[in-house]
């Protein structure tokens, strides 16, 4: 017959508790790391939406306006300036 003492049982329960707690802490760190990566990707997306896209729009619109202005305005001659 096997004698099981309370200290042995507590030691096994303690080991199981330690393993479960270690896995939970590891999962928390993994989830935090994945959330950080997701946040960085979202910030890069916002950078594209709020910085790169508007600047490209302003550049293209300015170029269009310059072309239309150049076509409609008659260049002045030097005789007009003197």
Curated annotation (Swiss-Prot):
Give residue spans on the Intravirion membrane side: 38-78
Q: Which InterPro entries match?
A: E_protein_bCoV (IPR043506), E_protein_CoV (IPR003873)
- Topology feature Virion surface, residues: 1-16
Which keywords does this Swiss-Prot/TrEMBL entry list?
Apoptosis, Host Golgi apparatus, Host membrane, Membrane, Transmembrane, Transmembrane helix
Q: How does it sit in the membrane?
A: Single-pass type III membrane protein
Q: List this protein's GO terms for biological process.
A: disruption of cellular anatomical structure in another organism; viral budding from Golgi membrane
Residues passing through the membrane, by range: 17-37
Q: What is its main location?
A: host cell
**Pfam assignment, any one:** CoV_E
One Gene Ontology cellular component annotation held by this UniProt entry: membrane
Keyword DNA damage annotated: no
Query: Where does this polypeptide localize?
Result: Host Golgi apparatus membrane
What does the annotation say about its assembly with partners? Homopentamer. Interacts with membrane protein M in the budding compartment of the host cell, which is located between endoplasmic reticulum and the Golgi complex. Interacts with Nucleoprotein.
> Which family does the record assign?
Belongs to the betacoronaviruses E protein family.
Q: Which HAMAP family match?
A: BETA_CORONA_E
**Any additional notes?**
Isolate N5 belongs to genotype C. Genotype C probably arose from recombination between genotypes A and B.
The job of this chain, per UniProt, is described as:
Plays a central role in virus morphogenesis and assembly. Acts as a viroporin and self-assembles in host membranes forming pentameric protein-lipid pores that allow ion transport. Also plays a role in the induction of apoptosis.
- What name goes with this protein? Envelope small membrane protein
């Amino acid at each position: 017959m096997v004698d099981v003492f309370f200290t042995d049982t507590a030691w096994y329960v303690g080991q199981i508790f330690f393993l479960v707690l270690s896995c939970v802490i590891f999962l928390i760190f993994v989830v935090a790391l994945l959330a950080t990566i997701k946040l960085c990707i979202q910030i890069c997306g916002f950078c594209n939406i709020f910085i790169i896209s508007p600047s490209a729009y302003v550049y293209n619109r300015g170029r269009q306006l310059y072309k239309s202005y150049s076509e409609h305005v008659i260049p002045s001659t030097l005789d007009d300036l003197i």
